[in-house]
Amino acid sequence: MSDAVPTESIQLQVLDSVLYGAAKAFDYLGIRGQDMLDKVGEGILDYCIKRGFIKRADDPQQFAHEIITFFKNNGYVRDVEVTQDGEILTITMRGWNFIPLMSKLRNQNCFLLSCPLWMANNSFMNANSLGWKRINERVTADGAYVEQVKFVPPAAATRLPPEPDDMSTVKAESNVGKRIGLPAFEATEYGLARAFDYLGAQAQLLLDSVGSGAVEFLQSELHVQLPKNRRESLQELSSVYTQGGLADKIDLNLSDSKLEVAFANYRYAPVLERLLDEGYRLTSCPFTLAARAVLRNAGFAATEMQWRVLNDRNAEMRMELRVAGQEFDEDKIGRIMDGV
């Protein structure tokens, strides 16, 4: 239930790397890319309900409260306050750990919200035929995010206020070293894998683009230095994600034809197991996405990935390699989005 405080956590930078990658991957669609990210929210809510992390409620206000409480208890936001004056709602978020990432994206002219809380909320709003017209936003001197909105029909909803806040002036505290509850990590990772299934053959290629963004994030935020040698680069990624708490140990066996990885006490294992049980072929493991990007930069691409989930959150992955070629087709994804 949403009032349960998790006993296990993972470093936020592990999740931030793929949230940054996801926003960057859809940036070329402009604000329509938010529709893609909101599909991640569908998976987040589905996972939370199936796992009993939140309780489904017929009352929209109660369900929204469940979502907020879940992310508060998982350490993603300290407090969310909503006040109303006539038609106008003022939402104040304190200790919101998306602000550093939002500032980084805004400074690159990317206005997509890959925040798990917002993606889940947007999905909930869409499912209930609700929309928000965003009026204004600001970040206060003490780091709180304040936004004013009003409810409108979905067709009149807006993704941004008329004048988005200038995040270049925000001195946001870095998320490096901060932690998030494991349930929130699992739910978001599940949503990322689930969201793109309808894209068919383009889906894995798009997730590979997310992996490229994850590598960019690690290099810029954690100052990770990746050697030109692909084996050494993969070892460095293994070290970074192990230190972040993705697994206690990540062992690699690399050749020109395959990559084999063994994960010990793998925090992604519950997500992986559920995806495989439900018949999904896509996975969103941060290490695997980043590793695929490193291999692609070295001229290799994966033709097939095989997973085995063992006991005690241990797992094994085998990735067949070939000479890289195809990239994801932006125009094709745009056409698919026209039908969403």
Question: Where in this protein do the model-derived segments appear?
Answer:
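N-terminal accessory segment detector
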Residues: 1-115, 120-127, 131-286, 297, ...
